[in-house]
Structure formats: structure tokens, C-alpha cells
């Protein structure tokens, strides 16, 4: 309905241009918004006020002219002018009911899909040779929910797990493994828990022993030069790390696979060419022996230009170099229309600089969009970054295990007589959903407080509340299995029926926002409001005990569409649903 309203206004504006009321070359973005007050209709626009200066008329006069030139539409019941010149549209109840019927019979809930694009999504991207910790959670689940939404909206999505699989840390690990195998033979274990120990012990050795540090640096050079022994060990480290990552992805219900991994090492052979191409364009400068690029747009507090370091004085490359190579690949090989980077907000300046440099150096197509989808920090209840009691980093697996335990206690308290196997399965779904939803329901650009108590509550905008809301709606159909809905149609007469129908019709608008802005919290908020609208409808409008058979069937259809929308929305967030809680 929103896009239909915009189309009506576009035709009216063209008519005013043809009549000479508005200059023919005037370009206006037609903004149509949902009204917050039902007395103001369903949609409102400030188009008349935008035209005032160009047309030389007062906005209320222009509003009337726009209304007079609107094409006829069976979707619109009436149009009114409000305030200084707002135009309010009231949608016809029958048109809304028809839209809802179409949504019921559609795999995409009746959403008008946009033109398909190829979208690269860079997310999760942990450093290998370490266990994933809670700091990886936000990128992983926010990115994955947006990926699901993009695919649902008909886009071709290329997942890119840009893992940190290269660099000095591998020299330290290789050197320490040599020491370990010298002491214990080839039987030295390579389990993931050992990798954590290896890393810490190797770092201590690197910091304390110059001989060890020298050996580690030589091993990095050997690794970069293709040494067979070093590469074999490096692949072992990476394989163990990736196995751990994908166990966590599976537990979290994240769609990343091994095929989506394209780490820093994938661009090693391209880095020298990046430097050479920047140099040939006269973009490189030297600063303290390093090769850097200065861009006028980026300065420090003193007004001095901030460099993008491309190559260190010792010849080593940095994140900017591999990011530029990756951008080139994503633009010119993958031929993407958009590239979305789900990376901590603290990297905002870095991405602003490399995005600008890639365009300046013509490494990427001018029309391609690069977007940093930054996110804030997950904090403990003390407001500080989430840590263990001893101040250490919280492993992601430990967080998920605790969520399982707490969810099991919660579910058991609600269902003391339930079979243990069923309890465990429900607790698994509730635990993972609660952790994910608590994050996804917050504006990604904001920091948030992690609280098991809040996220496992059945009250408020939480996963348990929404999962229960879904089971409540789905339960209606278990009691109405003998009702034939083949000839049923939706009727919107009661105020709460209209409210629920209006909320259901907003799903497409919310999805459009989620994919354009990368904001899962918009979908979370919508699902919470939808569950509330259904609750109000259910209390005011008897379903199985409706006054007439026709009304019962209509309300069953509204319930069916609510269940379908809740389930689809939760699945797009990466959450499983339950038929019983």
C-alpha cells in the first residue's frame, strides 16, 4: 500500500508539472510515512510543503492541487489535508483485506520484491588460532539475520567470512609448536584448547626471548614464501580453528559454511600489486619509512592529515592493504552491487578511509556501494565490556552453555511434568533464541547491557515472549482442525481486526528497512508489536466462538496470517519456533 500511495502521488506531481504549476525539472523525493494517530489515516506525506518554494504557492493550496490530480484508486477510501499542508490517506478496508488474502497465499507474504542485486556481506570474520569469544557474537548474528532478509527479498547474497588467518601470530604459533614437538615428538596434540594455550605461551616466549622472536619472524617469512612444512602446520591450525567456528555457527543457527571462508591469506598474492598500482597513480607517500596515502578528507584534531598505512617500513602489509585487495575482488570479480561490512563501530574511520581510497584509485566500480554496518559493544551489567569474574574474555561456547542451563531451569519451572528429552529440546531453542534476540532487538549502533535475567523473561520484547506468542496463535488451529477455510475471506469490521490487519500489512515496509539499513531491531520491534496487536484482537474478538461461521473463518484467517508472519519473521532473525512451550 505504501508503494501504491507513492505511485499515486508521483502521477499527481507529473500532472502538476504538465500544467506548469510545478517546474518540469523539479526533482522531489516522495516521502510517505505511516501515521502514528489513526485519526490521521494510514499514510501521510509532506510533499506539498516540499513544493512550496518551487511552485510559489502556499502548501495547503498545493496539497489540494495534488489531491485534485490524484488518479482514482479503489485502494484509497479518502484523502484529507491536515495542519500546514500534510496530505493524509485513508486506506479502504476491502483493499486491506484483499492485500491480507494475497499475503496468505504468497511465499513472501505478499511483499513486492525490489530489483534483485548481488550483495556481498562480510561478517563474523574471527581471528583464527583462538577460540571465538563474545566479541564475535554481534557481527555473526546481526550479519546472518541481514543475509537471510536479503535472500528473502530476492537478492543474490555472497557471504564472505574474512577470517584472520595470516600474520605474525602464526609465526609465534609455529615456533612454539616446534618447541612442543621437539619435547613431545610428533604426538603433540593440536586440539583447540591447546591453541588457546599455544597462543598465550607463544606470546610470552615472543615477548621474553629475543631468540624465539627472531625464529618466529623467520617462520613468518618462510610461511609467506610458501615453505611446505610451515604451510602444513599453518593449515592444521586453521583447520582446527575453523572446525570450532563452524560448530558454534551450527549451534547458533548461523548459515555460514566452509565455502564462505575467504580469509586474509586469499589476498596475499594481490598485495604487492595494490602497492604498485597506488604508486603508479602518484597516491603513495613515505612516512618514517612506511608507504602511506594521505587523503584531504581525513585529519586529526590538530588538522594534520591522517595516513592510510599501506606497507610498513619492514615490508609488511596491514589491514588496509588486504581490505583494498578484497574490495577489488568483490567489485571486479564478484561484480557485486553492494558490499556490507558488519564490523565494530570502532573501525569506522578505517572503513571511511579505505572506501574513499578504493574509489579514488579506481580499484572498484564507481556505482558499487560499500557500507560499514557498525555495531556497539556488548557490556556486562556493570556497564563495562562483558568479561568473566576474573576479568578475562568470555568464550562464546561458555556463554551458550550457560544460556542452555538457565533456559532449561526456566522451561522446567513452567512444565514440571514434561518429558526430559522434550524439555531439553525446548530449552535449547529458547536459550539460543534468547541470546540472539537480546542482541538483535537492540539498535546495532548502540552498546547494550547483557542480562540473562532480562533476556529469559516472558515479559517485554524478548525471545521467550515471542516464541510463546507464536505457540499461542498456532494452538488455535489445533482446536479448529475441522474448519474448512477453502471458501473463507477476511472481513475487517471490528476496530481490533482492522488494527491487526494494518499491522500485518506493514511487514513488507519493515523488511525493506531491514535490508536497506541493515537493522534487525526494526524487525524485532515489528514482531513484538504484531504479537501485541494479536493479543488485543484475541481478547476483543472471539475466534472459535465468533457470532457467525463467516466471522469465525475470517478470524481464523487473520490468526493464520499472524502465525505465518511471526514464524517467517523469527526465522529471518535466525530463530527456530516451537509448537509447544
UniProtKB/Swiss-Prot annotation:
Disulfide bond positions: none
Acetylation among keywords: no
Transmembrane segments: none
CDD domains according to UniProt: Anticodon_Ia_Arg, ArgRS_core
Any single Pfam family the record assigns to this protein: tRNA-synt_1d
InterPro entries hit by this protein: aa-tRNA-synth_I_CS (IPR001412), Arg-tRNA-ligase (IPR001278), Arg-tRNA-synth_N (IPR005148), Arg-tRNA-synth_N_sf (IPR036695), ArgRS_core (IPR035684), DALR_anticod-bd (IPR008909), Rossmann-like_a/b/a_fold (IPR014729), tRNAsynth_Ia_anticodon-bd (IPR009080)
Reaction equations catalysed: tRNA(Arg) + L-arginine + ATP = L-arginyl-tRNA(Arg) + AMP + diphosphate
Record localization: Cytoplasm
Gene Ontology cellular-component terms listed: cytoplasm
EC number(s) reported in the record: 6.1.1.19
Recorded GO MF terms: arginine-tRNA ligase activity; ATP binding
SUPFAM superfamilies per UniProt: Anticodon-binding domain of a subclass of class I aminoacyl-tRNA synthetases (SSF47323), Arginyl-tRNA synthetase (ArgRS), N-terminal 'additional' domain (SSF55190), Nucleotidylyl transferase (SSF52374)
Chain positions of motif 'HIGH' region: 126-136
GO biological process: arginyl-tRNA aminoacylation
SMART domains per UniProt: Arg_tRNA_synt_N (SM01016), DALR_1 (SM00836)
Regions annotated as coiled coil: none
Record key words, sorted: Aminoacyl-tRNA synthetase, ATP-binding, Cytoplasm, Ligase, Nucleotide-binding, Protein biosynthesis
Subunit structure: Monomer.
PANTHER family documented for this protein: ARGININE--TRNA LIGASE, CYTOPLASMIC (PTHR11956:SF5), ARGINYL-TRNA SYNTHETASE (PTHR11956)
UniProt similarity note: Belongs to the class-I aminoacyl-tRNA synthetase family.
Protein name, per record: Arginine--tRNA ligase
Amino acid at each position: 500500500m505504501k508503494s501504491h500511495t507513492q505511485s499515486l502521488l508521483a502521477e499527481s506531481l507529473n500532472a502538476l508539472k504538465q500544467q506548469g504549476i510545478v517546474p518540469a525539472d523539479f526533482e522531489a523525493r516522495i516521502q510517505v510515512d505511516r501515521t502514528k494517530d489513526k485519526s490521521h489515516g494510514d499514510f501521510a506525506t509532506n510533499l506539498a510543503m516540499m513544493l512550496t518554494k518551487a511552485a510559489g504557492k502556499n502548501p495547503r493550496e498545493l496539497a489540494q492541487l495534488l489531491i485534485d490530480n490524484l488518479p482514482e484508486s479503489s485502494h484509497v477510501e479518502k484523502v484529507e489535508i491536515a495542519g500546514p499542508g500534510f496530505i493524509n490517506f485513508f486506506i479502504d478496508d476491502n483493499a486491506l483485506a484483499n492485500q491480507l488474502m494475497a499475503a496468505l497465499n504468497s511465499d513472501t507474504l505478499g511483499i513486492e520484491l525490489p530489483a534483485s542485486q548481488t550483495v556481498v556481506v562480510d561478517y563474523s570474520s574471527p581471528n583464527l588460532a583462538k577460540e571465538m569469544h563474545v566479541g564475535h557474537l554481534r557481527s555473526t548474528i546481526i550479519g546472518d539475520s541481514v543475509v537471510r532478509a536479503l535472500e528473502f527479498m530476492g537478492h543474490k547474497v555472497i557471504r564472505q567470512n574474512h577470517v584472520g588467518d595470516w600474520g605474525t601470530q602464526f609465526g609465534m604459533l609455529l615456533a612454539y609448536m616446534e618447541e612442543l614437538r621437539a619435547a613431545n615428538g610428533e604426538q603433540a596434540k593440536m586440539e583447540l584448547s591447546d591453541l588457546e594455550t599455544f597462543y598465550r605461551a607463544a606470546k610470552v616466549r615472543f615477548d621474553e626471548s629475543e631468540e624465539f622472536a627472531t625464529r618466529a619472524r623467520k617462520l613468518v617469512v618462510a610461511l609467506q614464501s610458501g615453505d611446505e612444512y610451515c604451510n602444513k602446520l599453518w593449515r592444521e591450525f586453521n583447520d582446527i580453528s575453523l572446525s570450532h567456528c563452524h560448530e558454534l555457527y551450527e549451534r547458533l543457527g548461523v548459515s555460514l559454511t566452509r565455502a564462505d571462508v575467504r580469509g586474509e591469506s586469499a589476498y596475499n598474492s594481490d598485495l604487492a600489486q595494490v602497492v604498485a598500482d597506488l604508486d603508479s597513480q602518484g597516491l603513495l607517500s613515505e612516512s618514517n619509512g612506511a608507504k602511506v596515502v594521505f587523503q584531504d578528507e581525513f585529519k586529526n584534531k590538530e588538522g594534520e592529515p591522517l595516513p592510510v598505512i599501506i606497507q610498513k617500513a619492514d615490508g609488511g602489509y596491514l589491514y588496509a592493504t588486504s581490505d583494498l585487495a578484497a574490495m577489488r575482488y568483490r567489485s571486479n570479480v564478484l561484480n557485486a552491487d553492494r558490499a556490507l561490512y558488519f564490523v565494530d563501530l570502532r573501525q569506522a574511520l578505517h572503513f571511511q578511509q579505505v572506501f574513499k581510497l578504493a574509489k579514488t584509485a579506481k580499484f572498484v566500480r564507481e556505482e558499487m556501494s560499500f557500507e560499514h554496518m557498525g555495531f556497539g559493544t556488548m557490556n556486562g551489567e556493570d556497564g563495562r565490556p562483558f568479561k568473566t569474574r576474573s576479568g578475562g574474555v568470555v568464550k562464546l561456547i561458555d556463554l551458550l552453555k550457560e544460556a542452555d542451563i538457565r533456559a532449561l531451569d526456566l522451561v522446567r519451572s513452567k512444565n514440571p511434568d514434561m518429558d526430559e528429552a522434550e524439555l531439553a529440546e525446548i530449552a535449547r531453542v529458547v536459550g539460543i533464541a534468547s541470546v540472539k534476540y537480546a542482541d538483535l532487538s537492540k539498535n546495532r549502533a548502540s552498546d547494550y547491557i547483557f542480562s540473562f535475567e532480562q533476556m529469559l523473561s516472558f515479559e517485554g520484547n524478548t525471545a521467550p515472549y515471542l516464541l510463546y506468542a507464536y505457540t499461542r496463535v498456532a494452538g488455535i488451529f489445533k482446536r479448529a482442525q475441522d474448519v474448512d477455510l477453502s471458501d473463507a475471506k477476511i472481513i475487517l469490521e471490528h476496530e481490533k481486526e482492522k488494527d491487526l490487519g494494518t499491522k500485518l500489512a506493514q511487514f513488507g515496509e519493515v523488511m525493506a528497512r531491514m535490508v536497506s539499513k541493515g537493522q534487525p531491531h526494526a524487525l524485532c520491534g515489528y514482531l513484538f508489536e504484531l504479537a501485541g496487536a494479536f493479543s488485543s484482537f484475541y481478547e476483543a474478538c472471539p475466534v472459535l466462538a465468533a457470532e457467525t461461521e463467516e466471522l469465525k473463518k475470517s478470524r481464523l484467517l487473520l490468526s493464520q496470517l499472524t502465525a505465518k508472519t511471526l514464524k517467517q519473521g523469527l526465522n529471518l532473525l535466525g530463530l527456530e519456533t516451537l509448537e509447544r512451550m
